[in-house]
């Protein structure tokens, strides 16, 4: 959601008061909305050029490398190509003024005369994903997962656990390996508590269900080298998959479908289709 907001806001925010868009202005507008950009190139196709003043663009193409969406989330490579865009410039200017006054960054979908459709390709490296897993937001979510599913491990219903120190490894043939530690909830990381932690390893294949949800294929898992029963592992992975169901974006007027998922050693490539509806 954050990435889509950055790209669309950057594009529409580059419209000048008279309605003209140039590649360099658009590139700068998009660049300014990322935390950091290593490489970025933008190309706008528009024939005839007179359509620009009407808020129409034939096609927009963006290619970037090393794009930091947040201080913890880096995209190794990004390619985006849109279908024709049709924007109400007057409405756009009003939205920009309101956003500036309120200090908020919102999707400017109310300025769209027609839906926006785009193809998006992303590349994430193993190193960047592991950095994200160490972020405060992800750590907080992992604690909730641990409380919800691991509180009754070993028959000790009064003892809650939390997940800490997550690490992912990208393997060949669309497989991943996840390692995480279990510790008693509320414990701080010390030499003594580290010795009591349980190490969980999960390896699984990945596929896409109906274009919107990740499916775990033939998963296996262990806790301190003891196998995890499938009846216990299955529900946990199903719940994890539900957290990444992109149909949740439809509440914001965004329709997205995953067209391809390719996991190789050290990196993951994702191809998606995105459609944004005008908001009245």
What feature does the model see in each segment?
Residues 21-37:
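Alpha-helical transmembrane signal-anchor/signal-peptide segments
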Residues 28, 83-87, 276, 280:
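Membrane-proximal interfacial segments on either side of biological membranes
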Residues 1-2, 33-34, 233:
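Short, flexible segments with low predicted structural confidence
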Residues 29-34, 133-142, 146-149, 240-244, ...:
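Hydrophobic, Leu/Ile/Phe/Ala-enriched alpha-helical segments that form helix-helix packing faces
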Residues 35-128, 136-193:
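N-terminal beta-strand/beta-hairpin edge segment
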Residues 2-17:
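Hydrophobic membrane-insertion alpha-helices, especially the h-region
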Residues 195-280:
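Extracytoplasmic/luminal low-complexity segments enriched in Pro/Gly and acidic/polar residues
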Residues 17-26, 121, 125-129, 133, ...:
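Short amphipathic alpha-helical segments
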């Amino acid at each position: 959601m954050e990435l889509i907001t950055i790209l669309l806001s950057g594009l529409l925010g580059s419209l000048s008061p008279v309605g003209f868009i140039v590649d360099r202005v658009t590139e700068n507008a998009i660049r300014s909305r990322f935390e950091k950009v290593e490489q970025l190139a933008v190309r706008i196709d528009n024939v005839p050029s007179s359509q620009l003043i009407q808020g129409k663009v034939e096609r927009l193409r963006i290619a970037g490398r090393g794009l930091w969406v947040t201080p913890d989330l880096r995209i190794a490579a990004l390619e985006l190509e849109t279908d024709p865009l049709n924007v109400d410039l007057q409405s756009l200017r009003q939205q920009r003024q309101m956003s500036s006054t309120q200090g908020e960054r919102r999707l400017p979908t109310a300025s769209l005369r027609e839906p926006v459709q785009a193809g998006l390709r992303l590349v994430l490296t193993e190193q960047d994903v592991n950095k994200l897993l160490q972020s405060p937001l992800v750590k907080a979510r992992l604690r909730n997962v641990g409380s919800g599913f691991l509180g009754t491990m070993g028959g000790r219903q009064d003892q809650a656990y939390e997940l800490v120190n997550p690490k992912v490894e990208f393997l060949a043939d669309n497989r991943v390996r996840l390692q995480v530690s279990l510790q008693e909830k509320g414990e701080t990381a010390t030499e003594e508590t580290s010795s009591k932690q349980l190490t969980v390893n999960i390896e699984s294949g990945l596929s896409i269900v109906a274009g919107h949800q990740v499916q775990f294929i033939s998963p296996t898992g262990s806790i301190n080298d003891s196998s995890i029963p499938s009846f216990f592992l299955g529900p946990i992975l199903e719940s994890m998959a539900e957290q990444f169901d992109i149909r949740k974006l439809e509440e914001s007027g965004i329709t997205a479908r995953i067209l391809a998922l390719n996991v190789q050693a050290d990196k993951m490539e994702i191809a998606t289709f995105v459609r944004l509806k005008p908001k009245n």
